[in-house]
Design a protein with these regions (language model features):
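Short beta->alpha junction loops
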Residues: 68-76
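Short, acidic/small-residue loops that bind anionic groups at enzyme active sites
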Residues: 112-128
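Short, glycine-/small-residue-rich phosphate/pyrophosphate-handling segment
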Residues: 127-164
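Short Gly/Thr/Asp-enriched flexible loops that form oxyanion-binding sites at enzyme active sites
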Residues: 103-113
Length: 164
């Protein structure tokens, strides 16, 4: 009982005054090494906008979604976040940066959890250096979005909150 409202849990939904509200979706957005420099780093490739600024746009587009953002330049910290939220969130949007092409450990972490993930890259990694063409993460993800700039994050969130 909250005030004069009676709440009870029914199949992960909340009943309030006889109406059913769907549970709030929770999405984790993970950015890897050097992505803290968006807006400053190689603007011809990554653009002029910081990710923190762009995150406000995503939050405005999805007001009913809890977006949790985490960036780290350290592989173990990214793995810890996947472990922390990989069983109770509705989706993970991951741009592991250069770890995409080197980290079996992050791939194993994605494979060990039940939360679906979408891999995102701001630039078209297939049009860049050959060592960027292979992803260890892709086989562990529901999909991959590359080369669409920051919009790729929005598309990933949209997919993960859909019922597909």
């Amino acid at each position: 009982m909250i005030g004069d409202q009676t709440l009870c849990s029914v199949d992960e939904r909340t009943v309030r005054f006889g109406r059913i509200f769907a549970a709030v979706k929770k999405i984790l957005i993970l950015n890897g090494p050097n992505l803290n420099l968006l807006g400053k780093r190689e603007p011809t490739i990554y653009g002029n906008r910081s990710f923190v600024d762009y995150l406000k746009t995503i939050e405005a587009q999805f007001p009913d979604v809890q977006l949790h953002y985490f960036q780290s330049n350290h592989e173990g910290e990214l793995i810890d976040k996947i472990h922390e939220h990989g069983f109770d969130f509705d989706g993970i949007v991951i741009n592991a940066g250069a770890y995409t092409h080197t980290s079996i450990a992050i791939a194993d972490a994605l494979g060990a959890v039940t939360t679906p993930a979408v891999e995102v890259h701001i630039s078209n990694v297939h049009a860049r250096e050959s060592y960027r063409h292979h992803s260890y993460l892709s086989p562990k993800c529901k999909g991959v979005i590359v080369g669409l700039g920051l919009t790729g994050y929005e598309l990933a969130v949209r997919y993960l909150i859909s019922d597909e």
